[in-house]
């Protein structure tokens, strides 16, 4: 049984947010457990619509997001929710080029950042030089960027004519910018198999400014072309070990997108002492305790 031990306070650019330390008899090492949920909702600027409809998603995940399709409505939402939630993820469906159409929300996000306590995490899709310009003007607290390390995956899963080099160039643009950002890698994205993930890690190793590396795992989702895909679990675990060997572990987070039945991935992240896990199982929290770790709860997105 785990009990709330005491409340600490974590500070971020957008204001003061609470962190709960669970069952902490001695300060050994903290592992963060993230519960974004209602305190950190996801917003789609395109509603349920997506022009791209990648094979792993097919716009299904947009159906669970709050549809806010105009800057004015976004500001209204922020005013109404200020003080009630920690912040929100701003995302949406992609254009045929693989971009989330966020530019028209530049002033709205800037206003929210400057006038409310809400933390804003923006999920961009692929970005170029012109996107960096408006994103720096927008000035969100954080950018979440999905890194694709295989051109075959870009073509066959996402369905764009881009290449892995375009994604690596986008990382370089983010690293040279004034923006806080966290790369995300979807393990098993190529129809359940590991393909370009190792190259993505090697690229990230060369960067200087990223906050966290968020590792997630493909969920074979009903209603998508990948609903019957079988994950190469052994290959995914090997990749996670490679990531943990090559990236600072206190920057690696196991993100929310992953099959909940894949318990081994949670146990590995605890054993290897990564920074945190989003919504861990009770068995995983118990393992943290057995490993002498303190579990610190954050009701927000795992990039923070």
Regions found by a protein language model. Name each.
Residues 1-22, 28-31, 75, 198, ...:
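Auxiliary Fe-S-binding modules of radical SAM enzymes
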Residues 2-51, 55-66:
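N-terminal [4Fe-4S]-dependent radical SAM core
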Residues 29-31, 36-41, 59-156, 161-180, ...:
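Conserved Radical SAM active-site core
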Residues 41-43, 88, 120-122, 143-145, ...:
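Hydrophobic faces of well-ordered beta-strands that scaffold small-molecule active sites
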Residues 41-44, 132-133, 262-267:
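Short, solvent-exposed polar/charged micro-motifs at secondary-structure junctions
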Residues 47-49, 147-149, 217-219:
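Short, small-residue-rich loop/turn micro-motifs
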Residues 49, 69, 126-127, 280-283:
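Short beta->alpha linker loops
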Residues 180-189, 219-227:
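Short, flexible active-site loops
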């Amino acid at each position: 049984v785990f009990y709330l031990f005491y409340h600490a306070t974590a500070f971020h650019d957008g204001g003061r947010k609470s962190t709960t330390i669970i069952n902490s008899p001695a300060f050994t090492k903290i592992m963060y457990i993230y519960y974004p949920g209602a305190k950190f909702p996801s917003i789609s600027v395109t509603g349920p619509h997506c022009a791209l409809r990648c094979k792993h998603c097919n716009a299904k995940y947009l159906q669970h997001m709050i549809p806010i399709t105009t800057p004015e409505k976004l500001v209204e939402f922020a005013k109404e929710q200020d003080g009630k939630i920690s912040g929100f993820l701003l995302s949406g469906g992609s254009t045929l080029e693989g971009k989330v159409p966020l530019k028209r929300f530049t002033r709205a996000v800037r206003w929210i950042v400057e006038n409310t306590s809400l933390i804003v995490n923006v999920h961009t899709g692929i970005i170029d030089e012109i996107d960096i310009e408006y994103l720096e003007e927008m000035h969100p607290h954080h950018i979440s960027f999905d890194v694709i390390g295989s051109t075959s995956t870009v073509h066959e899963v996402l369905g764009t004519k881009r290449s892995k080099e375009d994604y690596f160039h986008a990382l370089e643009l983010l690293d040279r910018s004034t923006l806080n950002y966290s790369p995300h890698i979807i393990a098993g994205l190529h129809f359940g198999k590991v393909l370009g993930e190792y190259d993505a890690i090697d690229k990230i190793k060369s960067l200087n400014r990223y906050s966290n590396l968020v590792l997630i795992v493909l969920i074979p989702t009903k209603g998508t072309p990948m609903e019957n895909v079988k994950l190469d679990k052994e290959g995914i675990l090997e990749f996670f070990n490679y990531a943990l060997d090559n990236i600072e572990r206190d920057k690696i987070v196991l993100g929310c997108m992953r099959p909940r039945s894949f318990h081994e991935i949670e146990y590995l992240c605890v054993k290897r002492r990564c920074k945190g896990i989003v919504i861990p199982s009770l068995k995983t929290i118990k393992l943290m305790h057995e490993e002498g770790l303190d579990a610190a709860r954050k009701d927000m997105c795992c990039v923070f």
